[in-house]
């Protein structure tokens, strides 16, 4: 009985470890001046006057917020827990999925909350974006098109376009591989 229990615990621990990302081994795009990575948690001082902003009627583009990423190919589910000591309007922290400088989306919150879970599910040429307040019940906020079979950069991101900076905390980041739907369907039809 004990052997089975130890094997089950080891298998569960190995599975959890394999699905989690090691933040220490990820790459920075616009590394912040001050951050720590410890026990699977990233705490960063988000620099002032940083943002991700695409071309609009305002006439400028900005691409200088801190973004810690891993490159992921194929179909996947990415999830992260985000919190921030937001100070002024437009302070932001979340998860970015990036192919190149092109698109972004926002969840508007009417009141401050202690934390938020974000989840992205990539299937074929679509990415579904979800949020949750408890990591149990997720609400879809958007579906977007993304060319399939191209690698994407995925990870925690923050920006402070208006203020003097703030502290953001990211934890429980993991990317789980999902089987390619076309291959699964082909295998089922060609047995």
Task: Identify what each model region corresponds to.
Residues 1-21:
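Bacterial Sec-dependent N-terminal signal peptides
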Residues 21-191:
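Extracellular glycan-recognition regions
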